[in-house]
Amino acid sequence: MNQKTLKALEYDKIVEILKNMAKSTPAKEYFENLIPSTNLADIENELNKVDEGYRYVLKYGNPPTLEFENILPSLKKSKLGATLNPHEILQIGKVLKLSYEMRSYLSYTQDFSFLESMKKRLVNLKEVISRIDQTFLTADEILDTASPRLKEIRDRIRKLESRIRDELNSMIRDPKIQRFLQEPIITIRGEKLLLPVKAEFRNEVKGIVHDQSATGATLFVEPFVCVEISNQIRILKSQEKEEIERILQEISSLIASYCDEIETSFYALVELDIVFTKAIWAKEMNASKPVINTSGIINLKKARHPLIQKDKVVPIDIHLGKDFDVLIITGPNTGGKTVTLKTVGLFCLLCQSGIFIPADEDSQLCIFQKIFADIGDDQSIVQSLSTFSAHMKNIIEITKNADDKTLVLLDEIGAGTDPEEGAALAKAILKYLSEKGSKVIATTHYGELKIFAQQEDRFENASCEFDVKTLKPTYRLLIGIPGRSNALVISSNLGLDKGIVEMARGYLSQKTIDLDRIINEMEQKRKEAEENLELARKLKLEAQALKAAYEEEKKRFETERERIRKKAINEAKEIVERAQYEIENLFKDLRKLAENLKEKEVLKELEEKKREYERLIQSISQQEKQEAESKTKKTLQNIRLGQKVYVRSFDAVGFVESLPDSKGNLTVQIGIMKLNVNISDIEEVEEGEKKVYQTTSKNVKLREKSVDLSIDVRGKTSDDAILDVDKYLDDAYTSGLRQVTIIHGKGTGVLRQAIRNFLKRHPLVKSFRDGTYGEGEQGVTIVELRD
């Protein structure tokens, strides 16, 4: 990959962004020197690393800030036994701390093989970290805690310095001495504490003169009383320096003992910084890992140039190498042709550098050994074209080096010279590159190349869409449709006299008019196809939504039906258990009574009645067993139209309306409903067979005691009373009662009339009448239920 191509495709701008995003000095150097690879294994390996980093960042957030310098020279020094300076030691300490933080961040790498391997290379040297932390506050300040000896020396220095201050303060407070001083203050020259003495009183303050003012009027004197103390401090300062040197040597030796582990950890951090920088950029750009191939196929979906603002970039779909090898793009200036070239070329470079591309996940790219781009002299996305000579100089180099593993991008091929000669040259160059096996994308204004692309094998036309109504490009790439100049339409829309426009149209050749008409028809058909595709997509989504709603409703119905069934069985069990308990107690009492009366026949009859009740009690369990068995019956093998069948999922009997299809689906009519069911969901119903959903007489008898013979609705409104009566009649009928009493009172007769109007329409009511004397007369209604 030559530097001219990298710059023309603005690859350098992307790596500069990544360099600035990287935190460590080595990672920044990596991006500064990053160039695309041509080795398939290396590219796939790098993309897989970034993919792990990308997925990990999405799931667990961004990593710690990996800001550190290159510590390899310092590690080499420590290996040789040299003493490291504080800055070098602190940088090594930073790497060790970041290793610890990164290990913690990478706590969930079980499903991330690369990150797991990196985590294992990160050392946890708490001993070294602790030693560095207790030694340094900054690179310029070593703590007293660095060693007991250092603390002792510094404590002595501080005490002596305090003595000097006390002596000097005593002197400046002395009235006899104050008159010899310029000011009653202590001044510092170098590391000495001195008094500012007036020059004329030099001999009045005994001491050593260390400095004087610029005018010579003030002498800075160290009194003799402080000199001895200062000498002691000087000796201690020398000892302090020696102790610090010893501490630095000690820490350097400690680092040297772990040099290999630290170096391994350093390299792991650098690689992690690189990978996570690429991953975070991919997240910000909504980029994805491209699918790699070696067959020369490019298929980009929703590709977005990363240097165009997100709110302005228009995604493009472009493919090359499968059905055609040369794509000729035509269209207006600033319509997106150059952006398309740069997008394809840049994406190939990014992919071969192990960087995700801002496109849909299933986008494909080929690994090219060479990529050439002729896009003008340092032309940015919307700058003017280069000269003909500059174009030809680049194209000559391209034709000499192109082969079947080459991608060639040519912007405005043949431009800058006579149109006829330029078009001829363009045809020859494109034909030559096609015969070499290169993959080529070229932009042009020449109409002849549109026809050329239609005639040549493995060539295809494309255009950048232009809205003649708004007079603006849409930046959409339309493959298979050559571009139109739109000059006459645009001129007319801008207000050019219609006569001039028609005159210009008359100057067009018939060939040009026919071509323009064909292109227009193709574009209309494309728009119709897009509209139909969009309509089909919407209809598909609606159908999927309806299907999902149906499935959800069916599931809800089945769940509710099962809940009601289980509830009914549980209620029946409770009634049975309660009845069993009452029966047991009753028989105990009767047995005692019979024994006392010595009536063996009575006792025998009671025992028989008990056995009968026990048989009744087992009916619920028998019903459950029958229901379970019904679900395991074999499905029908031979089905005929009109056959009576039981549909399990609806718990109902119906009739076959249509025979099963190849998938076993058929239509069954249940009542007024026609349902599509599967053959596995139905079973045969023989004549006289009673399904488990039919109520048996035994079960009815068991529930007789649970429903009263009458219901009292006095004092209620007509609506509330009717609701209660309706439920009561259902319960009474289910329990086997055939005559019940509704107590509504006499009153005004409104409630009685409302109830009787309701009873006239009730399907369970056979007849009803007033109560007789002793039954409640007109205050009640006696209801006879159907069998």
From Swiss-Prot:
Record-listed ATP binding positions: 331-338
Entries under CDD domains matching the protein: ABC_MutS2, ATP-synt_Fo_b
Alphabetical keyword list: ATP-binding, DNA-binding, Endonuclease, Hydrolase, Nuclease, Nucleotide-binding, RNA-binding, rRNA-binding
Domain Smr: from-to ranges: 711-786
GO terms (BP aspect): mismatch repair; negative regulation of DNA recombination; rescue of stalled ribosome
EC code(s) of this entry: 3.1.-.-, 3.6.4.-
Enzyme class: hydrolase
Keyword Nuclease among record annotations: yes
Keyword hit for GTP-binding: no
Record-level Gene Ontology MF annotations: ATP binding; ATP hydrolysis activity; ATP-dependent DNA damage sensor activity; endonuclease activity; mismatched DNA binding; ribosomal large subunit binding; rRNA binding
Disulfide pattern: none
Task performed by this protein: Endonuclease that is involved in the suppression of homologous recombination and thus may have a key role in the control of bacterial genetic diversity. Acts as a ribosome collision sensor, splitting the ribosome into its 2 subunits. Detects stalled/collided 70S ribosomes which it binds and splits by an ATP-hydrolysis driven conformational change. Acts upstream of the ribosome quality control system (RQC), a ribosome-associated complex that mediates the extraction of incompletely synthesized nascent chains from stalled ribosomes and their subsequent degradation. Probably generates substrates for RQC.
Family: Belongs to the DNA mismatch repair MutS family. MutS2 subfamily.
Assembly and oligomerization: Homodimer. Binds to stalled ribosomes, contacting rRNA.
UniProt xrefs under NCBIfam families: mutS2
Protein's name in the database: Endonuclease MutS2
Organism from which the protein derives: Caldicellulosiruptor saccharolyticus (strain ATCC 43494 / DSM 8903 / Tp8T 6331)
